[in-house]
């Protein structure tokens, strides 16, 4: 049995490459990071950097064109990458880990009542009766702030915010230790986004659930983050506790990301990152951010290792 001092999740050298007509897409390319019990990690990065592929690699929700899938994923100290697909489905996915996919509110079945959909994972993974599953779904609705009467409604009868809450309830109904959320507020208005993050904080406090939150919404995610992982071109370039990251990020890419966020106070205008991210079909040698980095020097032609600085991890020669 794992202790509270042991990490809930530890990822080592995780690789996920896709085969396409143009070549191999290196979506996740040697990722390492971890997550403690009852901890919220926010994964930041531009669109196309591999964040969603990382989530699907952890959950083993893979398309047919996978070319390379390797590495180690330890959950409660067990390497679940060693599990066969059926064993992983029965013991891990929707049992210990669950997923709220991007645009989840649009993934609800329009011809089934919302309550039946929320209860379904519990029926299939735990074998409980529909009555028991509906009771748990009712409890989850209360937890995420959805009126009990909405159990008998269809998805098209709910607002976008309520559908998103229902999707979160579905991910929580089996009481997993880890929930991975992929852009859970991307299609919602600002007020609804704030309400969803308040729901997530409330759940974390009441259920002691750990989160991996994938987003490019830096400002809103800072309300929930305890740890921040920054992804660029398929690699983790910085991992830090949230207060240190938002006060003084270490990696040049992280600095540019924070400088792109509009400020309510002061006269400083948002900055932008010059250039385009590299293609994951043929990422450059050396540092993958070097073409856009204002601090580039000769050493950047070599692949930087991950350095430890003040308890934080950064993949940059500036901190050698």
Regions flagged by a language model, labelled:
Residues 67-79:
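Conserved ABC transporter NBD signature motif
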Residues 79, 131-149, 258:
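Conserved ABC ATPase "signature" region
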Residues 79-98, 124, 244-249, 279-284:
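ABC ATPase NBD coupling module
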Residues 154-158, 162:
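Conserved ABC ATPase signature
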Residues 173-177:
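A short, proline-enriched helix->beta-strand linker immediately N-terminal to the Walker B motif
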Residues 180, 184-268:
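P-loop NTP-binding/switch modules centered on Walker-like glycine-rich loops
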Residues 239-320:
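Short catalytic/signature loops enriched in Gly
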